[in-house]
Structures are given as C-alpha cells and as structure tokens.
A protein has these predicted regions:
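N-terminal accessory segments
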Residues: 2-200, 206, 220, 232, ...
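A glycine-rich, basic-preceded beta-loop-alpha segment at the flavin cofactor/substrate interface
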Residues: 213, 218-254
C-alpha cells in the first residue's frame, strides 16, 4: 500500500531534478553576451571611435541577418548550430587590429569570415565560444591599368574583381575561380585554382604584395612581414597566420575575344573514361 506514495514521491523528485538539470544546462550554454559585449566594446574603444556601430551581440535584431548572409553551407544554418557571441564588421584597419587584440585579451576564439565559402563552415562555427570577424565591408578594389596591377580587399568577391578590371581594360584579367560570390580573402589564402592555371599559374602566383594584421595587432605588408610569412599566406589557409586585409596582384594579358565550348558525354558514351 505504501508503494503508490513512494512512486509519487520518486516521480516528483525525478521531475524536480529534471527541471533543475535542464535549467542548469540551458544556463550553462547561454552565452554571457551582454557582459562580453560590454567588455569587448570597452576594449575596442581604446583602438577606434564608435565601436558599437561595428559590433553586434547575439541579442541585436540585426545579428541573425548578418550571420546568415554569408553562411554558404545550409547544414550549419540550423537552430542547433552553435552561434557566435559577437560579430564584428570592420570598416578600417584599426577595427581589425582592435578586434584581434581584444579577442586575445578576453581569451575568446576569433573566426575570420571572408565570404563563407567552405564545406565545413570553418569560418562561422566552433565548439568553443567564439567571435566572428566578418570582412564583408572590406571590399574596395583599385585597378591600375598603366602598371597592370590591382589592389583588392579581402571582402571583395571574384565577380566584383572581374567586373572592375573589365571596366578599365578589355585586355587585362586576373586568374582566379569561376564562382562569382567567392571572396578574394579566402580564395587566394587557399591558393586560388583558376581557369588560366596552365598559362598563368595559381592566383597566388600572381600576388606581389599583401596587407595583414598579425596576432599582436601589427599591420604588416610584404616588406615588414618578410618573405617567409608572405610565402605562407599565399596558400597556407585563411586566418592561419593573420587577418588578410588586402592582396596586390599583377594583372595578366587576356584576349578581347574568348571562345568557350562545352563537351557532353553520357555513361553509354564512356563518360567516365573521358578526360580533357
């Protein structure tokens, strides 16, 4: 006869423990965004004016749009995917320098996103609490036809680069990929496979200078970073050695008229054995 009250007691106790456990779990997972946001802003104020215009906490109404705009892999655009605590959208060098220094100061992981084109979402997901430094505002392009060079910031897309070069010259080009929404920073940091590979090499083979911010917040170019680091950032992977701000590359000659053709083969026609 005492079984039912005992079961009721155990059920109530279990339910209470479950509620406490869930609450504790949610509380532990919930990021201390306001606190981190204020600490981060206070730190950034030392390096730039009005940092609140470029820093978005995950409580900001604009946060979801900014985060999702450059998530190229839908697998990581889910409610269960861990989100960054903050997104920083730099507009000038000091913003990047301050972000690197402040992320190091508060001991939080920093992810650099330049277009978001990677199969594993490496630039916008992490198992640890993290901040995204999103380079989409960093997209200025300067084309110097006379000297046959171009300076392109990391957030510019390949499509934008091709168009700006075409505006200035019909006989100059840059060897890079075919996807117009891939950003320069990530593409060139990974080597830059392109359609003119056989004649002009990889994209990185045509890079003659770069501007980066290193882990100490120093602004460096090819001369000040040295040839070893300059060699490493051209294919060594985005964000491995610093934050890429811009690349300077030589333009290559291209014909005014280009002939494009397409060959289609079916399996019945031994398409698997067909190699161009």
């Amino acid at each position: 006869m005492a079984t039912k009250p005992r079961l009721a007691y155990l059920s109530s106790t279990f339910l209470l423990l479950l509620v406490v456990t869930v609450f504790t779990s949610v509380s532990a997972q919930a990021p201390e965004s306001p606190s981190l946001y204020n600490t981060f802003l206070q730190c950034l104020t030392k390096y730039t004016n009005n940092p609140s215009n470029i820093v978005f906490a995950n409580t900001n109404p604009k946060f979801p749009t900014i985060l999702q705009n450059y998530i190229r892999n839908a697998r990581f655009n889910t409610s269960s995917t861990r989100k960054p605590l903050l997104i920083v959208t730099p507009q000038q060098e000091s913003h990047v320098q301050g972000t690197v220094i402040c992320a190091k100061s508060v001991e939080i992981q920093l992810k650099i996103r330049s277009g978001g084109h990677d199969y594993e979402g490496i630039s916008y997901i992490s198992e640890e609490p993290f901040v995204i430094l999103d380079m989409f505002n960093y997209r200025r392009i300067t084309v110097d036809v006379k000297n046959e060079v171009a300076v392109v910031e990391a957030g510019a897309t390949l499509g934008e680069v091709y168009y700006r070069i075409w505006e200035k010259s019909k006989v100059l080009g840059f060897p890079a990929g075919v996807c117009p929404t891939v950003d320069v920073g990530g593409h060139i940091s990974g080597g830059g496979y392109d359609n003119m590979l056989r004649k002009h090499g990889l994209s990185v083979d045509n890079v003659i200078d770069a501007q980066i911010v290193d882990v100490k917040g120093n602004l460096l170019n090819r001369k000040t970073m040295g040839e070893d680091l300059f060699w490493a950032i051209r294919g060594g992977g985005g964000a491995s050695f610093g934050v890429i701000l811009s690349f300077t590359f030589k333009l290559v000659p291209v014909p005014k008229t280009v002939t494009v053709f397409r060959v289609e083969k079916t399996l019945e026609e031994n398409a698997t054995d067909f190699v161009l």
